Amino acid sequence: MENFAEKKISKPLTFGEGIQYVLDRISIKPEDRQTFKEDAQQIQNEFVRAISKQDPYFASAFRGLALTGSSLDNVRINLPDEFDMLTKIKMPCKLEPVPIRSHPGYVFLRASGDNIPIHLVDRWEDEYCIDRLKVQAWFRDNITAVIPELSNIRCNDGRSYELVNKTIGDVAHTIQAKCLSDPDRSISFDFVPAFEFSASEWPRIFPQHRNEDRSWYAVPSEFKYPNVGDDPLSFLVCAPYWERMVLTKKQHLKDGYRLMKAMRDANDMPKIYSYTIKSVFLNASNVNKLINWNQSPGRILIRAIDLLAMFLRKGKLPSYLVPDRNMLDRLSVDMRQDYRRKLCHIFRRLIRCRDRDCMTSEDLQFIFGMRY
């Protein structure tokens, strides 16, 4: 296919050509994909090795890293320089997920049997449950201890990296690897503590999904609802490999997903997270004929923007895994209205481009923040 991003353009593009131009601009170069992947693997290995050496309990509990997020779904744009990693932990006792009925998608992790890790649990009625604040403190203390020694991780082609702790949220531990030989190159990692469960352990009160016996996870997360008190025992369920099954073999869907991310970045909508966009596509895939995935990426983008605007108007975007959980709970009414207004303007501009089969440089600037 002709790469419009690499040619000189002397006349207005058709709608399809304009969309392809954007896809070419935001696509990841094969050489970048390879070198970032290799460097990330080496950095991850050194990071885990250092913590395992620092903390024998972590070494005995660690069960590997599982890629999640946009890199797993192959929808990252521009550079493959961010990696979301589930850090799998196995406790030496039995853990049972107990749904929190008042908070859809959340569970307690009840600990029982021998060898309950007293330093990571708290009392819940007459039983023990994993305390996410203690788990996060455990991770944080280990990271703080090893970061100073990870100042020169050697990778391929003479590149070396220094690690810096950038954690600010309540779920992931964010580590930035700064390339010492190239100040413009860095790699960001979000390490999320994750307790792994088999598909058969998925709580029965939650909707059932196609899973091919793949695992799901419980990750530390405070309640995402406004004006609700925190509970240190709360964990959120996630199943990235189940969700990946829904998106697989739908290349036009993934192209529409990438276009949505580029549109969001260009129009100052930072609270429309990548997972928010993913939830729009998961919901559309879950309802027969809501979107025709055989359409061109540009037409899928138009439909997806229309759907997101509808969800913002209603104030609710259902989670794919647990539909009673609202993915928009943390957006204020004013922010929802602001984002919806922007989306409606973009939607109308795209419709005009589609109907006249022409996408000018000004159109691309308005929608995607780029020109040809």
Swiss-Prot record:
Catalysis: reaction(s): GTP + ATP = 3',2'-cGAMP + 2 diphosphate; GTP + ATP = pppA(2'-5')pG + diphosphate; pppA(2'-5')pG = 3',2'-cGAMP + diphosphate
Gene3D superfamilies named among the record's database cross-references: 1.10.1410.40, 3.30.460.90
GO molecular function: 3',2'-cyclic GMP-AMP synthase activity; ATP binding; double-stranded RNA binding; GTP binding; metal ion binding
Cofactor: Mg(2+); Mn(2+)
Catalytic activity, EC: 2.7.7.-
Binding annotation for GTP: T68, D190, L236, V237, C238, A239, P240, Y241, W242, E243
Entry binding sites for ATP: S70, E82, F83, D84, P240, Y241, W242, E243, K261, S274, Y275, T276, I277, K278
Enzyme class: transferase
A GO BP annotation: immune response involved in response to exogenous dsRNA
Binding residues annotated for Mg(2+), in chain numbering: E82, D84, D190
Functional note: Nucleotidyltransferase that catalyzes the formation of cyclic GMP-AMP (3',2'-cGAMP) from ATP and GTP and plays a key role in innate immunity. Synthesizes 3',2'-cGAMP in a two-step reaction through production of the linear intermediate pppA(2'-5')pG. Acts as a key sensor of double-stranded RNA (dsRNA), the presence of dsRNA in the cytoplasm being a danger signal that triggers the immune responses.
Family recorded in the similarity comment: Belongs to the mab-21 family.
Designated name of the protein: Cyclic GMP-AMP synthase-like receptor
